[in-house]
Amino acid sequence: GLPSTVVPADECRRAIRPILNKINDLSPDFLVVEAGASPLEPYNGAVLLEELGDNLVCTILCASDPYAVVGVEQAFGLRPDLVTGPATQTSAAVDLVERLSGLQGINVIDPAMKGAFREFLERKLGVSCKKTPGAEAPGGR
């Protein structure tokens, strides 16, 4: 694999394009992409965002704290659709995310928030995430 966080942006871009073209040829309904990026370090997250361009339908920011949400918005000029991560691990943190940024925050590792996350995905992606009988993941999860 390519250590995309440590190569120059042009090299990263040259590596990403054939991968995205191959994925496009497969005509997937959705593509979930994870990009580790810091606005303060050259991790090539911005390159990936540029390459995906108008194909981005939903952006979920996993932020370390509520103030990082504002910092990422300012540094990348990107307004995420949802905030998760340590910035949402308490109700006070979720409230602060919403107060500072106006964005919804959901603690996706809290089983009680599973329904809220499902509703968010259904609304944002325009699909139904209802369980299909007998379609449980391995291990019953």
Regions found by a protein language model. Name each.
Residues 11-22, 30, 35-117:
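Conserved catalytic-core segment of NTP-binding enzymes
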Residues 112-133:
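C-terminal helix of von Willebrand factor
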